[in-house]
Structures are given as structure tokens and as C-alpha cells.
Amino acid sequence: MAATLPRDRLRQITDRFEYLEAQLNGGPDPSDIAKISREYAELKPVVAEIAGYEQLLADMAEAQNMLADPDMRPLAEEELPRLEAAIPAAEQSLQLALLPKDAADAKPAMIEIRPGTGGDEAALFAGDLLRMYTRYAEARGWRLEIVDLQESDLGGIKECTARVEGENVFARLKFESGVHRVQRVPETESGGRIHTSAATVAVLPEAEDVDIDIPATDIRIDTMRASGAGGQHVNTTDSAVRITHVPSGIVVVSSEKSQHRNREIAMQTLRTRLYDLERQKADDAMAADRKAQIGSGDRSERIRTYNFPQGRMTDHRINLTLYKLDAVMLGDLDEIVDALTAEDQAMKLAEMTG
């Protein structure tokens, strides 16, 4: 077995999988079912990769032994080239499966979108990004819920927070964090000149109660009237909720019609922001040791340009250019996400094996 795939580690993974399977079949404590099922589901494809890889190694050993038998030698000589080609591919596939998983990948996510430079056009583009992510969520069967939305006078957005729930949400959206730049002729531009503006996207993994504990003494809760486009009040009751986390200064707002629901959403958003702060601190602490990552990891980094006159989208982190901007803005993001994920895995694999 290759040095990068020690037999004892593979055996430990298989043993753990078999233990979890026995636990599920034996009727675990109801409070443990979700945790056991999640770990079992995560290990199942890894164990399948291990089984396939070890079967190839066994077939290779058998074929090499057959070379000594004159009657079996022709069959072995026919089989060996196939195995010699299959084993490296299987080993790489298994190495990818063994890469450390981000514990947040399976979590729901919060998407925060804010216009940057560019005035009204930036606010309109921020609205376009929200619609793009909404359509992407619909295409993947996810549930996207608007937590807070402040609209601009021309139909764009001043600020938006949305919650997305579904399978592998954070894993698929985490590379969207950064500055998105747009180049196009604004509808209000009579001279036909191309303007450049930008919007900032932050994708945060949603925190669970067990991730972050917030003492009641650390928060201040205020109620107010929800506001719509231009700042006008959209209802006559103080239903919107603003929560301030005093130690950090973080402020979150939820402005749905139900004040009770707004308290729940605002607290969830606050937990997520604080959880994200903890993750950023941990990332910063590891930065000196980290040799490979997609982009700088800085949310102020320009990650992508959307050029409407050319129908072009360019992701600057991996030098990916696609000439299907209309489809991208309609939520066709899988090709981009897949390319970013593949590059991230390749860099981590190179670091692990190099």
C-alpha cells in the first residue's frame, strides 16, 4: 500500500463505519440517532472507496502470481495493464475522499449582500446577485428565506441577509464570499457608457446552539417598525427586532411581520455572526501553516467580474472565464462551483501529499 494511504488508518475508518452500522441496527438512543446517522452517511462513500481500492490491490497481487503459471500467464498479461492504470486513479480518488472535511460544509448558510462602489447601479447589481442566488437555491432544491431586506429607491437593495437551508449548502456557497464586480451600461445612462460597480457577498455557516453560547446579559434587544424602499414604514406595529451584542458591537436586524419570529431569526443570525468570528480567528491562527487555499480568503478580495457587454463571467481566483453570463445570472452556478471545489481539493491534496 502506498505511503500516503497507511493500512492502519484505512482499517480504523472501516472499523468505525462497521461500529456505527451496528449502532444503527441495534436501535440507538433517540438523542444520538441524528449524530450517528450523519457520521455514518459521511463515512459510507469513503468506505466504498477503500473497498474498491483494496480490491484492485488484491487483484494486482493475484495477477502477478498468475505470471508464474504458464497456463494463466496470458490472462495475467492482459489484466495487468488495466490494473496498473486503475490503481493510481483509485488511489487519488481515495485520497480526495480522505481529505479533512470542513465541519461547516453540511450546515445551512447565511448570505449577506451589500452594494459597494457605484451608487444606485451597485444597489441594483446587489439585487441581481440576490436573484441569482435565489434561483440557484431553487435549482438545487434548497430553501432560501429572506431574513432582512432594505431596498433602494430604484428597486435595488441597500442590504440583504438571507438564510439558505438544504444539502451541502455551505460547501456549495462558501466560495461566493468576496467582492463581485459588474461592468455594464446602466439603464439610467443615456450616453451608453459602461460603468463599473461592485457588491460584497459574505457567506457564513449557520451556528447551532451548541456552537455558540450567548449569555442574556451580553445582548440588548430593541423593537422598531420595519422599513421598505426609501425607508418608509411598511407596517404600523413595532414588529422588527434589532439585537446588539454588547461585547463585540455586532448588530443584527430581522424585519418580518411576526415579532416573535423576528426574535428567533435575529438570535440565529447573531449566533452565526459570532460563530463566523470564531472561525475567522481559527483561520487566522492557522494562516502561517496554510500553504494552499482558493484566493486570499479575504472578503475584501475581488473574486469575480460580470461583463455584460461581452456576456462574460470571469472568476479571478482560478482564471475561469465563461461566456454564458445570462445563464449565470439565472442561477446556473454549478460549473463555477464545481471548478472552485476541484481546485480547492487539488491544492489540499498537493499539500497533504507533498
Curated annotation (Swiss-Prot):
PTM (free text): Methylated by PrmC. Methylation increases the termination efficiency of RF1.
Domain of life: Bacteria
Cell compartments where the protein resides: Cytoplasm
Keyword Protein biosynthesis (UniProt): yes
Disulfide bonding pattern of the chain: none
Assigned keywords, A-Z: Cytoplasm, Methylation, Protein biosynthesis
GO cellular component: cytoplasm
Name of a matching Pfam family: PCRF
Entry-linked PROSITE patterns: RF_PROK_I
N5-methylglutamine: residues bearing it: Q232
GO MF term set: translation release factor activity, codon specific
Annotated family: Belongs to the prokaryotic/mitochondrial release factor family.
Function: Peptide chain release factor 1 directs the termination of translation in response to the peptide chain termination codons UAG and UAA.
HAMAP family the UniProt entry points to: Rel_fac_1
Protein name: Peptide chain release factor 1
Gene: prfA
